[in-house]
């Protein structure tokens, strides 16, 4: 009989290593800082360049003043009235007052009413859409203890749009009716203080908002006074 053949060993089959998945390119829409030095950061998003300027951190006086105003007694009644005063800064109250003045105040009232309403709306737009995105200061209740009444706003803190709107309207109104200036500015100051008392703004937020509002209100009054 022929000799039995020895079984041949088969060399193990080498499996090809799995190909590495191609690296995904960075999403151009993702916002990434390209320059960040000190208080200024430059971001690129979807081909657009945005400059972010960090406002100075609230100083010691600012913090102490916030703690004092925010720590004033809170009662159900007082919080309700302060909240109503704060709501005037949203602009609807000033716009409604300006519309009433424009309809009932004759030729002068029309100019004053329109100037007041436009100033209030313009200040709200400038602060909310143009200034706040540059200064991304967080709200007081984010990094420190604060008594917050009502809604906790999700946007940035600096400057105060409510205060800017109120001072803009008060300035425009006082330009046409100087005798109304004390009352108008008292309400505007009250709006700014209410924002601090409710725990949603630092005093410096309200102060800078007031300055911006005065500038916009002056321009609005001058514009409609000239056109009239």
Predicted regions and their residues:
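Small-polar-interrupted transmembrane alpha-helices in polytopic inner-membrane proteins
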Residues: 118-132, 182-195
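Residues at alpha-helix boundaries and the short loops/turns that link adjacent helices
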Residues: 72-75, 91, 121, 125, ...
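N-terminal transmembrane-helix/juxtamembrane module of multi-pass inner/ER membrane proteins
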Residues: 1-97, 128-155
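Hydrophobic, aromatic-rich alpha-helical transmembrane segments
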Residues: 80, 84, 109-114, 199, ...
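Membrane-embedded catalytic cores of phosphoryl/pyrophosphoryl-handling enzymes
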Residues: 103, 144-228
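Interfacial segments of alpha-helical transmembrane regions
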Residues: 102-126
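Membrane-helix interface segments
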Residues: 77-78, 108-112, 141, 178-182
């Amino acid at each position: 009989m022929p000799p039995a053949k020895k079984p041949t060993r088969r060399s193990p089959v080498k499996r090809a290593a799995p190909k590495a998945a191609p690296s995904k390119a960075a999403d151009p829409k993702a916002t990434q800082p390209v320059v960040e030095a000190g208080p200024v950061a430059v971001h690129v998003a979807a081909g657009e360049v945005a400059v972010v300027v960090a406002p100075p951190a609230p100083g010691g006086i600012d913090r102490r003043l916030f703690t004092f105003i925010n720590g004033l007694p809170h009662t159900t009644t007082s919080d309700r009235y302060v909240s109503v005063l704060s709501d005037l800064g949203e602009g609807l109250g000033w716009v409604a007052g300006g519309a009433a003045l424009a309809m009932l105040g004759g030729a002068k009232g029309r100019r004053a009413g329109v100037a007041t309403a436009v100033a209030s709306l313009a200040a709200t737009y400038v602060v909310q859409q143009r200034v706040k995105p540059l200064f991304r200061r967080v709200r007081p209740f984010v990094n420190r203890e604060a008594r917050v009444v009502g809604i906790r706003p999700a946007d940035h803190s600096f400057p105060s749009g409510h205060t800017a709107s109120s001072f803009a309207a008060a300035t425009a109104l006082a330009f046409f009716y100087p005798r109304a200036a004390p009352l108008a500015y008292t309400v505007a100051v009250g709006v700014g203080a209410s924002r601090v008392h409710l725990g949603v703004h630092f005093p410096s937020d309200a102060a800078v908002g007031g300055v911006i509002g005065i500038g916009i209100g002056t321009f609005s009054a001058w514009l409609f006074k000239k056109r009239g």
